[in-house]
Amino acid sequence: MRIISGKYRGRQIHTPNNLPVRPTTDFAKESLFNILNNLVDFEDIGVLDLFAGTGNISYEFFSRGALQVTSVEIDSKCAAFIEKTSETMKADCITVFKSSVFTFLKHPYGNYDIIFADPPYDLENIESLPDLIFKSSFLKDDGWFILEHSKRHSFSKHPFFNQHRKYGNVNFSFFQKK
């Protein structure tokens, strides 16, 4: 796993083999951030990374200048890894919550420019995530919600759906209120 761009461009992050995660591939992550480059200015934004896993997406946003990154991960080993890696990178702007995403979303914590979610592909209630995000106060009015998912799911009929991109087995659906 490597950081694609920004202050820590090219930095390799070695993850322990015992983490129960499927990190977003470098190819898919680079493609995602190429799209985001045309949608947002990374400087001084707030980002919420749900189902953060290894923190791969959180580190990329930090490297590109995000002011605040909140990582939510239920697995203790993963949350500890994100905290340790953030300390090593001196990423004081990354805050880690060891919590279920569904529990976290019930308690207003902040207001974000981008919310990224990479749930397990077999998550039973993945279809409910866009509605949970848009019914909460977490996303700014002009903010973006990006959901990584398998090809089994289509969100094109959701009222805030904006676009879909596919990179190998990785699918990203983009949502925005405006």
Predicted regions located by residue number:
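Class I S-adenosyl-L-methionine-dependent methyltransferase catalytic core
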Residues: 1-178
